[in-house]
């Protein structure tokens, strides 16, 4: 399997503490990696480091060429004034995304019961999480970095997501 991304002997410091040090990790094509630990142990920091949104204080992050990393953070960055449709597909014409069975299946699986023209700011936390997941999952990524992806999800959505990620 081909190497996609990783890190070697990285250290990350915050102003009041060392988050972690001497961490090394490699992710190959087809890998499924779970990062577990207590609150505040640096799981989100490690994901951000691997995704390229944070630089280490020491060590190095490795990427195979232009590997595309899709990131789902703990909190969404959806525009509350946008409609669900705008948040999910942006300005992409309907004939482009609606003609793709994969995209239609993801929308139906996670957001089929959410009105397409509803404003994101009017949605519940679980609905917002599902919209953010749809936005991410319809993308074309080499690596998905999901930070607590089941937060705010009901059992049906968790089951759908687990089946989809198999």
Predicted regions, residues:
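ABC ATP-binding cassette signature C-motif
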Residues: 1-166
């Amino acid at each position: 399997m081909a190497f996609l991304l990783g890190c070697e002997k990285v250290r990350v410091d915050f102003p009041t503490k060392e988050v972690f040090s001497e961490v090394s990790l490699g992710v190959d094509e087809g890998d499924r990696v779970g990062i577990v630990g207590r609150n505040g142990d640096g799981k989100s920091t490690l994901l951000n480091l691997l995704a390229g949104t944070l630089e280490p204080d020491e060590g190095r992050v490795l990427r195979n060429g232009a590997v595309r990393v899709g990131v789902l953070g703990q909190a969404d960055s959806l525009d509350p004034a946008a409609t669900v449709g705008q948040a999910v597909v942006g300005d992409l014409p309907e004939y482009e995304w609606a003609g793709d069975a994969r995209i239609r299946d993801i929308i139906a699986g996670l957001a089929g019961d959410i009105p397409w023209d509803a404003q994101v700011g009017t949605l519940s936390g679980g609905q917002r999480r599902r919209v953010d997941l749809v936005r991410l999952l319809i993308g074309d990524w080499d690596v998905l970095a999901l930070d607590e992806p089941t937060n705010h999800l009901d059992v049906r959505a968790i089951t759908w997501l687990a089946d989809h990620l198999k």
